[in-house]
Amino acid sequence: MCISNYNSDVIARNVKQLGNGVIEVRRYNDGHIRADLSWVWFLCTIGFMFYDYFTTQSIFHDIQWAVDPMIRIEHVFHSYEDPQNSGYTYAGSSFNEFKKEMLELHNYRRYWGAFYILFLLFWFFMVISPKWRPVRFDAKRRLVYFWSWGQLYIMHYPKSVQRDREQLLSFLSPEFFTPWIRPKHFGSLVFNIPHENPNKRSRCVPLGIYRPACEYQNHALLNFILDYLGSENPDEEYGKFFKKEKRITSDYFNWFYQFSLFPQIGYNEKKTEARIQAWLAKNSMQ
């Protein structure tokens, strides 16, 4: 047992205890992808605003062209309207003729306006997207599984390796992965989980929160998972690790990176259990 490699502040932020030997581990991509997209969005927004302020100052007008071009057309028309001949420009063009000419001349600005609107809404799209469904580890039934887009990915490790840490590690074959944009100590713990249908492709699932609760969180998380799965009474022995002791720096980052207007995607317990039982019936292992 390697309890010295992890503590409750790390585990409680990454793992949820469900009871009866089952835990859920959060997905790395919840925060990793949002963090990358959020910073790109933020920097691009600032860049657009500064560029527009010091050059054309046209973003607001372009948005008006996209939302309601008549606002801009009427505004410009009043600037060219002949006070001696209401409804006509100095050049003698009627409002309808002027409108047609302006729509043809500034049609491209409607596309720019639509782009700015969608770009501003991008952040809203991110915050309405729920957090991904976590991966479950069932110590009593010796299962590792998760549900994704109607597909069950499941692994059943043999009883012979459950109490042997090295053999269990060899069977699960986890990996450590760090995206090139991240420092090595901010990496994830990756499990390759087979599809319930052996003829279909397995899924590599990065685990652990981003931003990590500590450096080399992936190593600490692996040690905990191995200890938990190898324990005879995991809920009692490791229950103390599921309660946070204090607030840490990564909490502030993670509130931003993982904020969502909707709760995390959960499991349909009855449907999931039925699929697991059907899979176990076909793939019994002692």
Regions found by a protein language model. Give the residues of each.
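Hydrophobic alpha-helical transmembrane segments and immediately flanking/interface helices
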Residues: 173-199
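Alpha-helical transmembrane spans
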Residues: 28-132, 251-286
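Phosphoinositide-dependent membrane-docking surfaces
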Residues: 142-144, 151-179
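N-terminal topogenic membrane-targeting module
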Residues: 12-23, 68, 74, 80-103, ...
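A short, compositionally biased
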Residues: 130-132, 139-141, 184-186
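Terminal and domain-flanking low-complexity segments
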Residues: 1-41, 47, 196-286
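Short, mixed charged/polar active-site loops
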Residues: 132-134, 152-155, 199-206
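Short, solvent-exposed secondary-structure capping/transition elements
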Residues: 127-129, 156, 237-238
